[in-house]
């Protein structure tokens, strides 16, 4: 009988420990009691009485004429900025990095080598798209002279070929020296 009591006591302690472990692990600090619902009482608007208005005495203010003095109008000089005319030749500066114009080598090599179809001129033409014809010619001339394109060619012919592919014109009297 003693073994039956000790087994029952051991089972009781084991279940007790299990119960306390589970309740401690799922501790919820929630308010389990529901709040009583309060029915809001209808609000009765309080009567509003107009505040008494106190008439203010009207005192006429004397009008003082302000003297008007005409201000002389001084014509502001609008100087028009004088831009020096560009001289023909490649003495100008290219607003594009000449190394980026290396993509134009594909256009020239595609035109010189026998290939089926047309070479893709889009990367080259998109670089000089926003430039005027003279700036585009200066940029391509700089790239050709620096041999950025990696092709030894006749510079004036290559320049006009590149400009024609991009639907640009070589400015008259322009010399890529």
Swiss-Prot record:
Keywords: Cell wall, Repeat, Secreted, Signal. Residues 1-25 form the signal peptide. Induction: Transient slight accumulation in response to a brief exposures to cold. It is found in: Secreted, Cell wall. Residues 52-76 are annotated as: 5 X 58 AA repeats of P-S-[IV]-P-[ST]. Sequence repeats lie at residues 52-56, 57-61, 62-66, 67-71, 72-76. Probable lipid transfer protein (LTP). May improve freezing survival. This is pEARLI1-like lipid transfer protein 3.
